[in-house]
């Protein structure tokens, strides 16, 4: 089949050909797969990809031929009645009997006939066919997993505009008006790089609902979002999709214009509208000149009039679509979104190539919010934002009228934004009404109920089995025993509810030292002379300090931490430290400090030599890196697992003070809870920078604000600081 498709459709994208070939071979193997459905699917795929009609017809003919051959060689399995074999079969060895003997519906004790020649009631040919059928079903699932993996591992490289137009086709006819924007897809199988992500899962998303997708690190949440964004999972084409996954590519386009250009169809329609308007103007002039010329050919006039009428109709469709897109308010909407995400009016006019990676990520988010897709997919949006920007995004999304599916570890953000929670685990998706706090409470209760039901069912089955074992050979009770055997066989297979292991982090005990511990006195700092980053900073860190530092990105928070650990030196002022003070510093980009070609155990031994393997293992185990995980190369670990190795490095330093720069990035909820508990138990001082409101609220007793080159104590809690930020932000709602 592969050769036929390749030879006839060489001009079609190789990824499409690969998918069609695999799907066709898979369907031919599967005795349950309907031929009409397969042929129709492959035909439409090839035609949409630009294949010639006659070439597609040849492929269709070949498919029909192969399906016909399959049907001719496929006999129906007979499971009822006895069939006398044409020849007897020697059954001297039980090990030679097929494992599918149970298919015949009756049992016999083979040991009782060992050494004798018996006439089997099993038709060998039909038994082999049954085995092939079972094997084909298993192969089908494996093959589909390989195709899903290949499509995700090697995605097509397209520009943003090409990808947008391919994923979100334009409808000018209005045929999609009134269609439901709800999504309901059953039987989803998804794999990535050979690992099963979902098996037979159901995805249900209702318009106007905002879903938080939660689950442990490495469970496949980001993979699911990517599959949805590429329509690997069959989302109806009238539903527009946008996924904020990676930073945009920088060029000379101003930031504001790049947001406007994100709505590709709006840009295309405006250009088309201008072309049509110019052409209509030209036609009117030509008609006017023809009307003055008595010798002019009337056929030319009629042709121009027909063209004018057609262009008038198309122009009307375009204007209606632009009105539906709220095109006249586009620039003000884009500017407001950018302002909410921290872009000043001056920054909005800067070329996108002048922004750093973090700011380009914000631009990607702004572009998605501006487009207002029917399905907005956000993957850890708070990782790229500061507290003021998170507050703006949270308020903005609460007025969003379409579907939002967001992956986030920020509990406070999910509590404010999410109307529902989807819990991804064990290759399935479970749904919960309410925000994250409600989900957390409900899940605990649901798990307890499932465990109670499982134990109850197991007790019932044990009771049935006990009766069967006792009376199955008792003549008086044999009928009752047989009845219970049938009842037991009809019961569904039970799987014990899976409980997720609780993660625990543990920092070592702290040796007490007398104050003063760590101080900054009238510190000023400049990277470039004449451009101050920090001015007149005074801060005192004690053994019982729990200081949270917040403020806009780029305000100097990380710079202040680097001054405290003497990675940077002040332009003026004094940073004083206790002579015996040990500080453990967690860098925001901690992955850069790890040798990813080593395993965690070897890395700790290399970085902190002189200790035994057991001590290294103990420190890694204190942060959930144990067993085989400690021996895996760190390049194969997830972001959260790498963070755990970094925390283990902190523990080996036996610190008096922990200085943490965005420690919650990449951690799942369970790891965040473990880190929160560990920081609260830590007996030394803590100063940390974080955008996670819930983490700050649970670990910090004082909030310091870094803004406009000044670091000052905020008089209030982190929640009050967030409200203060919102009061300074532009208001923005979504047009209904």
Curated annotation (Swiss-Prot):
This protein's record includes keyword ATP-binding: yes
Chief site of localization: cytoplasm
Domain called ABC transporter: residue spans: 183-459, 518-734
Cellular component GO terms, alphabetical: cytosol; cytosolic ribosome
SMART domains in UniProt: AAA (SM00382)
Subcellular location, record wording: Cytoplasm
Superkingdom of origin organism: Eukaryota
PROSITE patterns named among the record's database cross-references: ABC_TRANSPORTER_1 (PS00211), ABC_TRANSPORTER_2 (PS50893)
Keyword terms: ATP-binding, Cytoplasm, Nucleotide-binding, Repeat
UniProt: ATP binding residues: 215-222, 551-558
Similarity comment text for this entry: Belongs to the ABC transporter superfamily.
Protein name: Uncharacterized ABC transporter ATP-binding protein C29A3.09c
Keyword Repeat attributed: yes
UniProt GO MF annotations: ATP binding; ATP hydrolysis activity
Gene Ontology biological process terms in this record: cytoplasmic translational elongation
